[in-house]
């Protein structure tokens, strides 16, 4: 939206004239930065604060945003509104200062809802697969020439950004259930990929509460809107009768409205047929591995079909799909001769998955595409509460690899919980007798401890949602070769 469009929006909503300067606390997060980027392109004055520079803050600076790498009361001076992420505590000095100055303080999703208010909103929710599905829907709409605005929780690799301002009526956005703030959104179309027990502190440990919140989210759709839901998921199947909106189901299940059939994976690509009611079958080549990504594609196709997008555009977008950052992200294939003296190579893949279901899907995709590879995982558990609540599931899933290195738990601000640490998890896995995990307490020693387990025909999965992505990039930069004095800054 250019300045002329902004003026038009402000004429539709005269009160928007009051909003000139928008300040984001925690602006370096992908979700926050994406919204800030769209608003910057709409002509608003953007400022924000975070603890350290990153690619998100660098992109925003290039758009004219003012970024502070501290949290101080004076940072919010002259702001019309302050937007906060769920990771920011109420005693943050900028939030306190905003309240004292009677500046409105809103959550990220509330600002996203304002962006969606006068657009055709497509919101993608669910425990797993949101980011990739959002990117797939965005890619299809872009390929069809519909020029959508999108706001994603991860880097859309084809665009090189987390968010992009389009000039059409379409807004495609990831909807985050972690703090229940997705209830602010009022989309025209909503996808729900799956529902599992995660972020249960938000829902007071009550899974029924979580399920009802998803129902409430879907009931934010207008009566003429549409819910697109994965019927393979047992919780979604249970909830379907309670959804009082038009629905389209998708999945491998025989009763799905959009059904995946004849799936096979060859290397990084999935090949399958999509059967649609009253429509020609689609023979899909998807440039993303794993059955879980076939489901994500089925959701995107269901939405695109409902919109009337041409089948050829759908197929082109899926075959050329470049994926999202840190989702089965290929970082390179490196010769092992300089690493440990062995012939052959090792592939390096970075993946954000940090829930047992996500880790399992990544392992299955790796096994399906590269069945002869020695599968090595460097895993970083994320949050002590998640490690505690899903301890047995993690232990079961992680025994499926051939070699496992484990970093300490990434706390994400949490205090340690006895028995929910990496040493305990390694011990439990070792006692099951399938593999002997290696605990890596010092991230600077990853390359040194990784080298001996590589055989010359390896696929290395760097797995987790904490700072392990930095370690993956470091391993790529040094081509897996142990350094004489490995720098600690990458950890």
Swiss-Prot record:
Signal peptide: none
Known pathway: Cell wall biogenesis; peptidoglycan biosynthesis
Domain of life: Bacteria
Alphabetical keyword list: ATP-binding, Cell cycle, Cell division, Cell shape, Cell wall biogenesis/degradation, Cytoplasm, Ligase, Nucleotide-binding, Peptidoglycan synthesis
Keyword ATP-binding included in the entry's annotation: yes
SUPFAM superfamilies linked: MurCD N-terminal domain (SSF51984), MurD-like peptide ligases, catalytic domain (SSF53623), MurD-like peptide ligases, peptide-binding domain (SSF53244)
Family: Belongs to the MurCDEF family.
Record-linked NCBIfam families: murC (TIGR01082)
Name of the protein this chain belongs to: UDP-N-acetylmuramate--L-alanine ligase
